Every structure is written in structure tokens, then in C-alpha cells.
Amino acid sequence: MTTYVKQMQRIVDEYRLAGLPWPTSAKSIADWAITTGRWELPAAAIRRRCADDIASAMREEYMTDRKGRRVRLLHPAPLLTEGQTEMVWDDIRTASRSHMQISFQHRRKGIVGDCRQMKVDVDSYNDAHPEEKQIEIVFDFAMDLAELEAADEAA
């Protein structure tokens, strides 16, 4: 875990120890952290923040393909550049098959990671609350995808 992440977690801990409202929003904690001088944007973070905002905007750009499907236009792929892994973005209309395959594999890995973490969280919650009906999560998304595709075709 990075030092910066630990710093952010420490701010949350300090917020809670200060007896401020909980549960709360990240914005409320941010307002408190800025007001109390616990956080300010480091100069090195400005470039990273700008890049993150640009990446978020690129992730939200869509087009309609020839079959009428809403498709994400720009896709990142982790590529080795000058000895460092960097997310390189390309346009789905002009990107190489190799770029798209790497991008899709990377996205799938992220989805699997999210599912794994959800399973750990659900298992932990269930273990901590054995007296309650256990929460069950199905990780086979085939039916969900089929239903969404059927709804798209019906529209």
C-alpha cells in the first residue's frame, strides 16, 4: 500500500477519532481534512490528478456501432514503455487487435478482482453475523448478460 493511501486512511481515522458524524461521505471528510490543514495537494500529484481526470473522461466516451450498440470508444492497455508499465489508450475503430486483446484481458482481470474482493467481503460479513440469514452472491453472469442483451434487442 502506498504512503499516500496510508496518509488518506490516517485522515479518516483522525476524523472518526475527532467524534465527527459517522457514517459520512468522503466529501465531508475531505472538507474537514482541508479545513484542518491535514491535506493539501502535493505538487507531484497535480499531473497525476490531471491524468486521472483525463482517463475518466476517456472511459466515458461512447459511440454507436453499425449494429446500434453503445460501445466504449477509447480503451487503455497496460504496455511496457521505457521500462515502465503505462496505460496506453487507443480508439476501438483504429486500434490493433493486439492492443484490444490486452485491453480486454486487463478489464476482465479487474472485474475478476472486484468479484474476488466482494466474495471475501460477503464471506467475512456472513462469518461475523452467523445468526442472520447468509447473504449469497452468484458470480455466474451468463443469465444477467443474456437478459441485458435481450432487453437491448427488444428496445
Task: Label every model-predicted segment.
Residues 1, 5, 18-27, 40-47:
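Alpha-helix N-cap/helix-initiation sites
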